[in-house]
């Protein structure tokens, strides 16, 4: 292609999961894209747990795939174990989770980026974003990003910039008394950019995360541990894949004990978190083992999962034993666990805190409100998790591409936005920019009020055609979706026209109350297994199980789904009422000082967003609504 450094449309800063999806999206939409990262060989690393997916997280991975992203395909290519979580519960909270070969995963990410047209990789550290409307003191008031500056002094121009710095922006690693400016153990932090952003007027904070030690498989006795049952059939994340044929690796369940806890209690004073050296807030739902022991003193044990890091490595990941205690204490602590009495640690557990950009300074398109053309995604926005990062990354990449294109064509910029009823990604971004964060944000099904519509099996139905319309998704994906929808209609027709017979009832006693009813009507009975109905008809049994289950769920929960649709229609009216970008809230008499301050800080885009803000009363919403209607 041969375009020079001055020719880029989009620059992505950082090569983690957010950066990879952002760069791929922008490049695939035809924009000349540069991904700058400190170490090209570290692109796409699974820095912590060797797994992808989980409750609500698996939904996000499938949404990324439906949008034309790659995380689902990477996961399929590296899968070594598959489990559908919450199978005994309702379909709204079921989600796929896989163990991944972490080294193969990173190779796939790097190779895909290298092979993508319109995309270049460059190894350097970005220390500043050059903006218009910058004062002599470096402050920016509603300027526009048009270049980045690197540590080696290169100035590279761009029409849009996406920041995906992960834990590296001003990162510091802690292990007992050891402390170093690193974003990941052994990898130096990115200095300069955080200070540059503060100078421009951005409000920054610090958050913390951590990771457990890794041990050698040959040094532990897995035979005394409980093998974790996995699903017999590996199912793909990507809608482009039909089946997965890969080697399987086992995970194991273990527990801490009173000896473990006593050792930890005796060494609380050596933890940098308890001594006050780490002041940043950590992830509530993934606490360190010392935090668990301190908060739950009556617990006699805490569950651990022993997980393989890949097929071509002997390293095991001890899920549940995150720590920042000194290495000598980690050695002793791990050896109190059954089967690990002679464990050899290859990499110690550690904590890392890092700089974040408070996300209320972003619009719903993940563009900063202070600097147009500057987007951010992933842990810099206060989230935790590979999946949350990837979900933000693809949206930031799409919108950076659309913004860059608009500056070339001089046409109006129309951002790509996912609403709360369209995707978990939409829920997450709305939460971040509307409510902000005071701790690392993790996605849960409970955060989504329309989760019956946001099931993992419907991600393609919700998002694929939207992605195709903006030039990101392939036509083959749309054709696959259309085939699936035709199949669903065929299944529905068969369920509506076939009835439960006496023969069926004699074979299955639970069908007796439903003799003469259609299969569809029978499915509304929650005690009737979906698979039972499929087995009653040879034609139905030949259809893909996942597609049949999707139809069955929609029939069984149609009244709940209809109620959600009504609620969505009501909310849409509020979302349709826009608030001008520089609206003067001081003009509204009757608005409390607290509410006015919050509104001026967040600068919501719509009345619907105002209603979801923290500390905003219904009366405030009505006052604002009345003023806008004048």
Curated annotation (Swiss-Prot):
Protein family (similarity comment): Belongs to the MnmG family.
Pfam families to which the protein is assigned, alphabetical: GIDA, GIDA_C_1st, SAM_GIDA_C
Gene: mnmG
Described purpose of this protein according to its UniProt entry: NAD-binding protein involved in the addition of a carboxymethylaminomethyl (cmnm) group at the wobble position (U34) of certain tRNAs, forming tRNA-cmnm(5)s(2)U34.
GO molecular function: flavin adenine dinucleotide binding
Name under which the protein is recorded: tRNA uridine 5-carboxymethylaminomethyl modification enzyme MnmG
Binding site for FAD: 14-19
Superkingdom of the source species: Bacteria
Location of this chain's protein in the cell: Cytoplasm
Keyword Nucleotide-binding among record annotations: no
